């Protein structure tokens, strides 16, 4: 199982392609949905990339040992989750359901929560046009099946406007493959079904990487190639 909707990873990956940011990503490969990031993950998968900042989506650190290791390696931490917890963290921990958080909207999807972080960073760095990523945020929120009220409802409503006119080559290829010209809930479900990893754990990880490439590529032909591959992969055998 993947605890984080990879649409959220795609959004973060695409949005963070600023000239001064060198962004890498790691798809979480564990079947155990309760597993957290441990010291081995940090040493072998994260420090290996020379990371200065680790942003985790839906996966927390296992213990204070991991926090200490990140401090020793000069890796700053931002963890995004949305679940009830009373444990205090010594790092940036964004969770509307943590004890003491006064944020009004407690049922934000992880995608919506990521978008809130994007908004805050965009304001700080005076970055423009982050709303164009609402197409991906919409897909993640719809996949999570969150209540369509509050900020989730606003994001889904606005996201539909960006999705139908998306400039994302991957989403556009998927929509054209499914002959989607008008957007409704059934159309969104079709998109989600095509770009949701399936199969064994290994197969899911490999497909998730391919899907990630689909959603961040700037090559129209490559997007069409991947979308057709995914379509044939999921097409029932006759």
What residue spans do the PLM features occupy?
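Short intrinsically disordered, low-complexity coil segments enriched in acidic
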Residues: 1-3, 97-98
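Hydrophobic helix-and-loop "lid/oligomerization" segment in the mid-to-C-terminal part
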Residues: 2-54, 122-238
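Hydrophobic, small-residue-rich alpha-helical packing segments that form membrane-like cores
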Residues: 14-111
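Short alpha-helices
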Residues: 87-143, 150
